[in-house]
């Protein structure tokens, strides 16, 4: 059951390694092939990624939320399957309702909630986050091992590495 206020791995919660492994490996228990797995951390049907991180970590400094956003993006782009982003995720999009609340179902909300704030894009935090996303996309494109198209190829090229740290996830990916 999805709980938008429950912290996940990106927010510092200790999560089941088998679940994390399955995500990185293209959900082999659910999808026959990795390209049948669509990887995302936010979509139009719920909070934006940044809003969810802020809800889960209400006292976290903005820079912590930005780092968590980038970690979530790394999960999306470094996992087997099809990456999917909500519009504006790469520029820390938020849908504020006012009084510290965020809109989780904004299809009837006005433009002031749904609009992408293009005037903020010159800010260094937005530029740095956008550059980070672009770097992840380029990295994924450059390494075929991150874009396997068959279950056997994933099994032959992606290997979880045990770190002994419950808050660390590590993989070795080989381009073949």
Regions inferred by a protein language model and the residue ranges of each:
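Conserved alpha/beta catalytic core and glycan-binding cleft of carbohydrate-active enzymes
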Residues: 1-92, 96-97, 107, 144, ...
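Residues that flank catalytic or metal-binding motifs in active/ligand-binding sites
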Residues: 36-37, 112, 132, 167
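Charged, low-complexity, helix-prone segments enriched in Lys/Glu/Asp/Gln
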Residues: 62-71, 113, 133, 137-140
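Extended hydrophobic/aromatic segments used for targeting, binding, or gating
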Residues: 91-131
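Short, well-ordered beta-strand micro-motif
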Residues: 117, 170-172
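Catalytic cores of secreted or luminal carbohydrate-active enzymes
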Residues: 117-151
């Amino acid at each position: 059951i999805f709980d938008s206020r429950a912290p996940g791995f990106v927010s510092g919660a200790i999560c089941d390694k088998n679940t994390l492994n399955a995500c990185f490996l293209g959900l082999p228990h659910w999808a026959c092939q990795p390209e049948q797995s669509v990887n995302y951390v936010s979509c139009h049907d719920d909070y934006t990624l940044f809003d969810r991180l802020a809800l889960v970590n209400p006292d976290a400094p903005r820079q912590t939320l930005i780092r968590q956003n980038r970690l979530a993006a790394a999960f999306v782009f470094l996992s087997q399957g099809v990456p999917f982003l909500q519009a504006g995720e790469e520029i820390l999009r938020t849908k504020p309702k006012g009084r510290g609340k965020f809109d989780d179902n904004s299809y009837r909300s006005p433009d002031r909630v749904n609009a992408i704030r293009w005037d903020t894009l010159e800010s260094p935090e937005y530029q740095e986050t956008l550059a980070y996303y672009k770097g992840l996309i380029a990295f994924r494109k450059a390494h075929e091992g991150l874009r396997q198209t068959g279950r056997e190829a994933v099994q032959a090229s992606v290997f979880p590495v045990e770190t002994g740290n419950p808050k660390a996830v590590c993989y070795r990916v080989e381009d073949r």
